[in-house]
Amino acid sequence: MRVLRYTACTTRHTCLNTVIFNWSLCMTVIPVTEQRNPASYQIDTKSTEEILTIINNEDKKVPYAVEGAIPELTKLIDRLVPLLKKGGRLFYIGAGTSGRLGILDASECPPTYGVSADTVQGFIAGGDDALRRSIEGAEDDENHGVEQLKSAAFSSSDMLIGITASGSAPYVLGAMKYARSLGSPVGAISCNERSKTFELADFPIFLPVGPEIITGSTRMKSGTAQKLVLNMITTTAMIKLGKVYNNFMIDLMPVNAKLEERSKRLINEITDCGQSRAAEVFGESGKKIRTAIVMASLGVDKTEAEKLLKAGGGNINFAIDAHAKHAD
């Protein structure tokens, strides 16, 4: 394969034609995530504002790439939700940026939706040390991911999603093969249409963001697209699990002053009970927003609110309806 070289010059048109020609020779053998982006040729000669504009223009393509994956994401989530309802878990596995994004999404589910830390878990090649610094070669260990899944007692009741921009990391592929051997549902998120992970996935999520503006720097568009998709997966799943009322997160964990104030404001907005009453039921409920909403809505105490919620399967509307039927 021909090595590509160029030097900055005033005859930009001539240089650009040469580079495009050479680039086209490589397209059939290099994954799209490793290809050069024509929009950023000679980016090292640009002004600061020009560089930022190039980056921004490329980033605008990301939401459209994600939009195309919605049908397959729908299938994945519709399989995931019943699994979670039965006590199953969601696991992410990835190397580098992909692994960090999976762990980030998993770590934000407990405080946002009140689920246990076991419900959504993330693993990264190289372990926790790789969260803060790059551990070279970790993604080449095909057995490491398998060992991590075994340590978490991963089973056929759980779902695994492999996250990898290029789709070729042995660490991810090994874990996906193991999950499939157990009969677990397996998803894959990749920005390369010929991703090896897609061959192992029940739910292939292809994100065609194209080449990065810095060749091979998949922490950029690829990482952004992956983050958007992970947001969509867990947010939609939690909505379907009843963790959201209207567009409020009613199971958030008020672990600091900011979140306590948000919780009181949320109770007041939903019930229109007044801020002082919202603060009162928030405290009486043991800082459980869902319980406080029923207390404020129906004028019942914590014990009765919890009984109604249990009868309604945790659904606030069902709890209120059950109270109304009982009153009749």
Protein language model regions, located:
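Cofactor-/ligand-binding subdomain signature composed of acidic, glycine-rich
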Residues: 27-65
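Short, amphipathic alpha-helical interaction segments embedded in low-complexity terminal/linker regions
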Residues: 232, 237-328
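Gly-rich Lys/Arg/Thr-decorated short loops/hinges at beta-loop-alpha junctions or inter-strand turns
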Residues: 56-62, 122-133, 272, 286
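A short, well-structured juxtamembrane/interface segment
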Residues: 68-83
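Glycine-rich phosphate-binding loops that contact phosphosugars or nucleotide phosphates
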Residues: 91, 95-229, 234-241
